[in-house]
Amino acid sequence: MLEQVDKAAEVSDDDLRRSFTTFRMELDLDMPPDPHSERYRTAVMDLYAWLHGSPYELSNESTDFELGRFVDVPFPYSTASGVTVGNHLMAIGQVIRTLDLAAGSRVLEFGAGWGNITVALAQMGHRVTAIDISQQFADLIQARASRVNATVDTMVGDFSMVDELSDSFDAILFFESFHHCTDHSSLLTSLHRIIAPGGRVLFAAEPIEEDFYAPWSLRLDGESLWAIRKNGWFELGFRTSYFMDALGRSGWSAAKVVCPGLPAADIWVARRAG
């Protein structure tokens, strides 16, 4: 199956994404009853090891690419796909519109990747810190920001860097990144330390679904299986009721902001409860 996907990728990004829809996996999993328990988390990690072929390593999340090639033409523009580019721009616009930040706000983006939102917010005059596991992504963000005379503070590390930060932020953003966290409960709790009074945490374009097959677990659609098996990425999905419960247990309340015409770009906005 991976061979067929790779062949589709050689044709175009659209063909690659169409190939993802041709397969998925259905599993009858006997998961521990308490989704907040360490036993449950261990079961998810065991499922990952079975799907990927070896236990999870944080280094799997790092992306290797040729920096110079993507400074001027980063993802999604590099795909040359009208659908992919259009959807991505819609999702980014939804984030910026939902944030609606006051001038000069402090923003932290976890898993900033290609830097599309980070650089856009920096161009708007916000003070942006971008954290990513990949040094190459950090270098790319700096190069892209420099091209537009914007300033971004980049840091290389994983989600655990939340415990090393000394600043507070008006907004903390996860865009297609929260679902890569192997210990999301601890992360949600730790965010309180760095959120400014009245600040918000945004979970944007994250796989949070009413009818997800488990409270939380690895996604079993074609694209996720490909990403787990080939790249070793951690690809979680969340049932809405579980996600809301996890937020509540961590001291957050949240509301959903729907993206018209693109459900995959819906946003959950969390604030301190009470």
Show the residue positions of the predicted features:
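N-terminal accessory regions of S-adenosyl-L-methionine
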Residues: 1-92, 217-230, 267-269
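Conserved beta-strand/loop positions that form the S-adenosyl-L-methionine
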Residues: 110
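Conserved glycine-rich SAM-binding loop
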Residues: 113
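Class I SAM-dependent methyltransferase SAM/SAH-binding core
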Residues: 116-161
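A short acidic, Gly/Pro-enriched loop at the edge of an enzyme's catalytic core
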Residues: 163-172
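A short SAM/SAH-binding and catalytic strip from SAM-dependent methyltransferases
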Residues: 171-183
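A short glycine-rich, Lys/Arg-flanked "PGG" loop and its adjoining helix->strand segment in the class I
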Residues: 185-197
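C-terminal alpha-helical "lid/dimerization" subdomain adjacent to the S-adenosyl-L-methionine
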Residues: 204-260
